[in-house]
Amino acid sequence: MLISANEMCFSYAGESLLENIHFTLNEGDRVGLIGGNGEGKTTLIRLMLGELYPEQGEIFKKSGARVGYLAQNGGYDSYNTVWEEMLEIFAEDHRLLKSLSEVENAISQVPEGGEEYRRLAARYESLNKQIAARDSYGVEVKIRTVLGGMGFADRTEQVIHTMSGGEKTRLKLCRLLLEEPELLVLDEPTNHLDVRTLFWLEEYLASYKGAVFTVSHDRYFLDKTVRQIYELEPKKAIRL
């Protein structure tokens, strides 16, 4: 279980917005949420994220669960280039590869069979195991795959600060996909996608290892990417 709500209620400005909400999100779930404007979809997300708290009932989140959230128009600003920003996600992989290179260099300068050689060889083996487990050598391929799919293949050296709001939102989605959180929460993710990037995202999410919770008005996109859908009617959620 990643997130579970039981008899959850929430009011805004004295008006009841959500009443007796029940749902459970498990590892690997694909859930969609639809509903009209003002019926509490974003409020429900904020309750899930712990940004708001229910007035009645309970909501539980798995301890230590990594959650990635794409808000509507939820881009971010940075003076890094696109490539620099994506590489930051894999700082540990960079550290491991750098350490391996340093150990390789050190091994080449000590006699074989000695105590220092054995110590370095053990360190080399340990680093190699960590790198293999994390697929650190595949980092650049991962980044180029996601950036290419989302339309940034030829813009890796562009400074993020110079981009439009829609482009920054798409780039935030790229970052979330590369971070691979246990739960990916997407609020209207198709707003800034063209047909090509939309199709690519549908295919990518099909093989995503974590759980995905998507709010969208695009029912076709939901039908392609989720396994169950809730409709948020006034004050309650109903599974379709």
Language-model features: locations:
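ABC ATP-binding cassette signature C-motif
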Residues: 1-240
